[in-house]
Swiss-Prot record:
Any GO BP annotation: electron transport chain
Record Pfam families: Fer2 (PF00111)
CDD domains per record: fer2
Organism encoding this protein: Hyoscyamus niger
Localization (cell): Plastid, Chloroplast
Predominant location category: plastid
Task performed by this protein: Ferredoxins are iron-sulfur proteins that transfer electrons in a wide variety of metabolic reactions.
Keywords per UniProt: 2Fe-2S, Chloroplast, Electron transport, Iron, Iron-sulfur, Metal-binding, Plastid, Transport
Name of the protein in its database record: Ferredoxin-1
Family: Belongs to the 2Fe2S plant-type ferredoxin family.
Requisite cofactors: [2Fe-2S] cluster
Amino acid sequence: ATYKVKLVTPDGPVEFNCPDDVYILDQAEEEGHELPYSCRAGSCSSCAGKVSAGTVDQSDGNFLDDDQIADGFVLTCVAYPQSDVTIETHKEEDLTG
C-alpha cells in the first residue's frame, strides 16, 4: 500500500506518497526534501518528529522509549507509514529537552 505523508517543517508543509515498505526519511529525500538525520539506524534522535495524525511502524528503531512513542515521537529514518500520516519534523530539541 502507499500512503500520503505530510511533513510539517519549519519551512512549511510538504506532502508526498510513501509506500508502506519505505522509510519516511528515505522517501522524503527521494522527493527532494531535506530533513535532519544522523545515524539513519534508529539509534539517535537527530531525525525525530512528532506524529500529529495517523500511524507509523518504527519497530526497527531502538532509541525511543515507550513513553516517548506514546507521546507521538517518531524517528523518521526507521518509520514506515501504516496510514496517511502527518508528522511535525525537527523535534529533536523537544525530545531531548
